[in-house]
Amino acid sequence: MKVGVIMGGISSEREISLKSGKSIVDSINKNKYEVVSIVIDEKEDIINKVKGIDFALLALHGQFGEDGTVQSVLQTLGIPYSGCGPLSSSMCMDKDISKCILKAANIRTAPWINLRKNDAINYEEIEKMGYPVVVKPTHGGSSVATFIIKEEKDIKDAVIEGFKWDSEVIIEKFIKGDEITCPVFGDKMLPVVAIKPKAEFFDFTAKYADGGSDEFVTELPKKLHEEVEKMALATYKALKCEVYSRVDMIVTEDKVPYILEVNTLPGMTPNSLIPKSAAGVNISFPELIDMIIDESMKVIR
């Protein structure tokens, strides 16, 4: 089977995508697959460069790669691909839509408001939520242009910065607590990974700089683990995820978990969060890649 590892793209997360793609190419079982690297530099490449492959292994992140666009093109071309379909990908990429769905499904997520470019900032609503709040692009990733705002006077500048990256900006209540991530594979949750950023929160530097954070498989107290697992699986189902996704949460001091967001194409280097989680149940990185391909091939699109 000829597998095209698709990486690069046109989003702000291009460099991270190239790292994920290279790691997959380096680690995939070459005895089992014929592997080609496909670097996307412009949108047309997703049509022009995929000819002749039997399967697209997606290592794209951010807009155009993680928002359902590429998935729709591949589906139209009849090329099987890894991970979630177009609908789930687009819903998870849009933090406003995904939070609306979670709220409707009675899955706990922080209060928020969403702004489009011509909307007035509703300071009264923000005051009701209570400071601090998080301001970030609605369709952004890797915590790019994400700010923790503690006073009303700083809101406007953060919103202006957010609009440099996106057509919509989300303002949500900052939940103080410990961040965890819960990889879901099929209908099962893999081991929980704790994230201990050395900065105030898990920002771009903490995510990608060496030593920016400590990340490790953790064992939660039984009752909390059960609630986290129930929420992760319910979130995966509500947002119609397929094959695998990463559900990020924050757990307060009182052991109350909140859903932060869902990543449908999370980082895939050996040191990324999903491979770390898989290693906790003795699944190697090459084995994880195999599992993703096998499960993706079973999905009827």
UniProtKB/Swiss-Prot annotation:
Ranges of residues in domain ATP-grasp: 99-294
Entry EC no(s): 6.3.2.4
Alphabetized PROSITE patterns for the sequence: ATP_GRASP, DALA_DALA_LIGASE_1, DALA_DALA_LIGASE_2
Binding positions (ATP): 126-181
Secretion signal span: none
Binding site for Mg(2+) 2: E261, N263
UniProt cross-references to Gene3D superfamilies, sorted A to Z: 3.40.50.20, ATP-grasp fold, A domain (3.30.1490.20), ATP-grasp fold, B domain (3.30.470.20)
Localization of this protein: Cytoplasm
Pathway: Cell wall biogenesis; peptidoglycan biosynthesis
Keyword Methyltransferase: no
GO MF assignments: ATP binding; D-alanine-D-alanine ligase activity; metal ion binding
Positions of Mg(2+) 1 binding: D248, E261
BP GO terms, sorted: cell wall organization; peptidoglycan biosynthetic process; regulation of cell shape
GO cellular component: cytoplasm
Role of this protein: Cell wall formation.
Similarity-based family: Belongs to the D-alanine--D-alanine ligase family.
Protein name from the UniProt record: D-alanine--D-alanine ligase
Source organism of this protein record: Clostridium botulinum (strain Alaska E43 / Type E3)
